[in-house]
Amino acid sequence: FGIPRQYREMPQQKREATSYGSGFILKDNYIMTNFHVVEDATEVIISLSDRREFIAEVVGVDPLSDLAVLEVSDDDLPTVNVGNSDELRVGDWVIAIGSPFSFDFSVTAGIVSAKGRSINNNNIGNYVPFLQTDVAINPGNSGGPLFNLDGEVVGINSQIYSRSGGYQGLAFAIPINVAMDVADQIINDGEVSRGYLGVRMSEVDSDLADALGMEKPYGALINDCLLYTSDAADDVIS
């Protein structure tokens, strides 16, 4: 898996940068983007479509979901309409807006290929049920919005699957419902809280279902209870 990010700005840019990405503005001057876009940044500069620029403050980040919330001080900012990613269906058309390779405010389109994808990339896939699309995503698109045809943000473009390092038709976006839950916790609580079962589980595949005498594979198998957690023997009744 590759994370689409831009390591250097194009030569004609005035300001030298070590990372280049996209984002979108929510109400109350908050901005959402990917964590890997602002990771280790000493200064974050926001450039709008009307060419205004602002220095943004990082309100908080959540590396496990690859999300970051920024804030700028201005009362005249264009905001997006937030949609409901749960209402997306496979085959729906979606549109991405971002700055691939520093080509600002580029638009690409495609369809939702799958929902609830789990990918193994720096453990992010363990916490995010990704939307898979065939929208063209390249370095610089990270953190940018994925819109439905009603103009509502339904995802945050985050990752690609590639053997060459470039777009190959497999792009992954964080569902906006997941992103907004993370953002609300960062803004209101300063951190993200997650539930913890204290057990190791594995997915029940066809082979395991046969071994357990199941008619078809479904559910999960609890393999072990972790030490020093609230779970203990006899806690689970089967």
Residue ranges with predicted function:
Residues 228-238:
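Single conserved hydrophobic/aromatic residue that forms the stacking wall/gate
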Residues 1-227:
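Serine-dependent protease modules
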